[in-house]
């Protein structure tokens, strides 16, 4: 059986405020907003894209609980997504130039060309 191509995958983040999150991804991280809605008066879902990377986000009416701590027994990891980029140092410098703040310092790991965000 031949394999059908999967051309990408997009993480889905629950956020406190979709318009604010969309602005952050556009203005600070350099993404393009490709969708926000379902209407101009009721924006609770959005999609951003930068090159081949896409992120979907949704507001659910209650504050999300971030996974910035690690508790394996409870099934909680401290990261939500990995970025694969040809030049992680350049991306880190770009984010620093845009005054992006992280809970933990961006780090290289043992996998080449991957950064934890």
Language-model region placement:
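A detector for short, charged/polar N-terminal pre-domain segments
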Residues: 1-5, 68-71
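Vicinal oxygen chelate
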Residues: 1-4, 13, 83, 92-117
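Core segments of cupin and vicinal oxygen chelate
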Residues: 3, 12-54
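Eukaryotic phosphotyrosine signaling hubs
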Residues: 8-9, 76-80
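Short amphipathic alpha-helices within nucleic acid-binding modules
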Residues: 23-24, 89-94
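A short, acidic/glycine-rich surface segment
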Residues: 34-35, 42, 57, 63-69, ...
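Short hydrophobic/aromatic beta-strand or adjacent loop that forms the aromatic wall/cage
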Residues: 43-45, 78, 112-115
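Short, charged/polar surface micro-motifs in flexible loops or helix N-caps
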Residues: 51-55, 61-64, 87-90
């Amino acid at each position: 059986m031949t394999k059908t191509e999967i051309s990408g995958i997009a993480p889905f983040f629950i956020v406190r405020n979709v318009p604010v999150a969309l602005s952050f991804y556009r203005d600070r991280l350099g993404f393009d907003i490709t969708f926000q809605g379902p209407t101009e008066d009721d924006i609770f879902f959005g999609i951003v894209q930068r090159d081949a990377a896409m992120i979907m986000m949704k507001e659910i009416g209650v504050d999300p609980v971030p996974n910035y701590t690690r508790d394996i027994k409870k099934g909680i990891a401290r990261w939500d997504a990995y970025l694969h980029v040809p030049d992680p140092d350049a991306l880190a410098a770009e984010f620093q130039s845009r005054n992006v703040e992280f809970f933990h310092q961006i780090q290289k790991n043992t996998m080449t060309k991957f950064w934890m965000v």
